Amino acid sequence: MKSTDLISAFCRPVPFWSWNDKLEPDELRRQIGAMQDAGMGGFFMHARGGLETEYLSEDWFRAVEASVDEAKKRGMQAWCYDENGWPSGFAGGKLLEDPENRAHYLRFEKKPGFDAAALGVYTLENGHLRRVTGAENGISEYLCVYDCQNSSTVDILDLRITDAFLALTHEKYFERFGAEFGKGIAGFFTDEPQYFRYETAYTPVLLTEYKKAYGADVLDLLGALFVDCEEAPGFRFRYWRLMNVLYTENFMGRVYRWCLSHNCHLTGHTVEESELYTQMWCCAGVMPFYEYESIPGVDWLGRKTGTELAPRQVSSAAQQLGKKQVLTETFACAGWDVTPKELKRIAEWQYVNGVNLMCQHLYPYSIRGQRKRDYPAFYSEHNPWTDELKTFDDYFTELGYLLANSREQADVLILHPIHSAYLTFDRANDEASVRSVGEPFNVLIERFGAAGIGHHYGDERLMEKYGSVKDGRLTIGECTYSFVVIPDCGTLDSSTAALLKDYLSQGGRLMLAGRKPTRIDGEIADLSFLQGNLTWDELVRERALLPEANRDVRCTLRFAENGNFLFAVNLSETDTADMSVKLPFAGVESYDLLTHEMKAAAFERAADGIAAKLYLAPGESVLLMQNDSAIPQAQKSPIAETMELGGKWTRSAPVQNTLTLDKAALSYDGKMYTELLPVPYISERLLREKTNRKLWLRYAFTADFLPDDLTLELETLQHTKLSVNGTEISLTGQGVLDRSFVRGNIAALARKGENEIV
């Protein structure tokens, strides 16, 4: 399948479809139809907690077969998710059965005596680290580093383990559905692959790979990861750079090449992309990861936005590498009470920074039991505004299509400083250890975003592979830059230093935005050639689209065969934005993404283009399409019409009048009950107590009047008796909230006043 074919078929949102119960082909087909009705263009078949069909069993593959068949009939995209849970790599637990496959990490201890069990033992002498191989006179404190393992994840930096993962997962799909690869099955989603992030990561692969890369024994200075010494910056640089290489090449590169050789695509995301120090936890830099994806992706949790770092890292790499689509797995952990307005703001913040394809988290097969607590909200029939989902999805389909098929005006390159974080990163001190690099960088990129200066990030590994200089401009892959910005940083790769030296010698324009680096490849070096010749004020005059006082509006200027445009969004949740934006057009109109209508837009002509007027309410956005024949318009009042409300009004309920009983009293004998407790608390309490005995749960509600139809709906419960006001009943009707639920009319058993259900 060509990339262009994939884009035309895969422009609608594609949710995580949580396969979390006993999978029935007819129900799978029905849910696929519901997805299409909601404006979705496909799905990721994602094994998650609650799954009762055995993962990768014959029944599992029958479910896949039915889903692929239904997707083909409907012109939708079916994608495989490469794991049972996450992070990717452990093959549903099979690889964890062998201790040799488990992830490694390092533990550091100071001891009064030499410990032969340690991976490496060191002493500190006058600020220098020295490895010792036995007890020595005069050493009072031995610095010991231990190789430890964790039983929950595998060592994906080991090619042997990656190949085993592919054999146990991807090859199984190919054996069954090889003819559908690139047709009915678009490809695979990989989720949060990582080295062990909860301690200082390590892999035995380093014992050979470090010597190949640097001609030295990694154990000679391993203690420098934990001890500040003269050797620490250089060693840490070499260590973490190689860890990043092993992460991207031995896992992601290997999986990507397998997918390409089997006629399918790869998408997904790494983990903890939003800060430099969190990237150090997991992979030592996310941008090289994106080289090995057909559709690079990012993950964004919760209902807040952050700095532009996470979405702009992935979109920078995608544009440089010629990958049109950029995916976001988004909306997890936003909570049941999140509103469409909030979700629109979260998504548009990512889209204005270069994302263009939505993967909603989550579309559950079932919400029975704990399944309903799987990082909600859900974007399925369980959503109270499910009838409006299609409008929401249609909007982002149109926006994503326009962004994917356009080129961003971004000829400013900001060097990504993750390699400077290598010099000082210490897992024990975490964020504080790289704060001197991370904080100034966050301030800098927010300044660029607020000014509306189109920019990308330059990852030094990608620059080494794809960077070149010609006529005083720096190129990375398919993107060329007229300006380069060096943020506050401590080191440059030797390949980066060579590029910049060539760039400056050809008259390239360079801005130094902080501490000038003093090292190359982590070692002290002469960088006297690195002299800035560009100021912030000069860059603002030449490239800023937004006024200096702006805080909340972000924009992207786009050029495309079908029309050039500006997309702008007000990210504030409370403040209206009222400002002008400079555009290199002769005129603009406002484009409605839902109706496809063009409307007059306020602008006035200027010497070098126009000044378009923006008046954006909190969370509001606008798309201004170039139309050089448009006539300048004065800004109209945002209040189009006023009316006085009076008289009597009738309020209508858009859904059934329902009451959720989410608190219960717990008893172990049916006589003595606790106070009313939240049901999740009761569940956690029983798990802590490891209770395996008869229980009673008493729910209560009060009725002021008794309707003819008083329906009780609850989850299907095995080995359970149910009573209403002391009368035992059974419910047989199919539930409405979820098809696994049951319901029935209890009006005849209810009474005015207090009622109880046990």
Q: What residue ranges belong to the model's regions?
A:
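Short, surface-exposed tryptophan/glycine-enriched loops
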Residues: 740-758
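Aromatic-lined ligand-binding clefts that engage carbohydrates, nucleic acids, or primary amines
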Residues: 701-726, 757-758
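Extended low-complexity, serine/threonine- and proline-enriched intrinsically disordered segments
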Residues: 116-126, 588, 719-726
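Acidic/histidine-rich, surface-exposed loop or edge segments in extracytoplasmic proteins
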Residues: 10-16, 46-50, 146-155
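Catalytic and substrate-binding clefts that recognize carbohydrates or anionic sugar/phosphate headgroups
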Residues: 90-179
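Carbohydrate-binding surfaces of carbohydrate-active enzymes
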Residues: 6-14, 22-30, 42-48, 55-93, ...
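Aromatic-rich membrane-interfacial microdomains
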Residues: 730-743
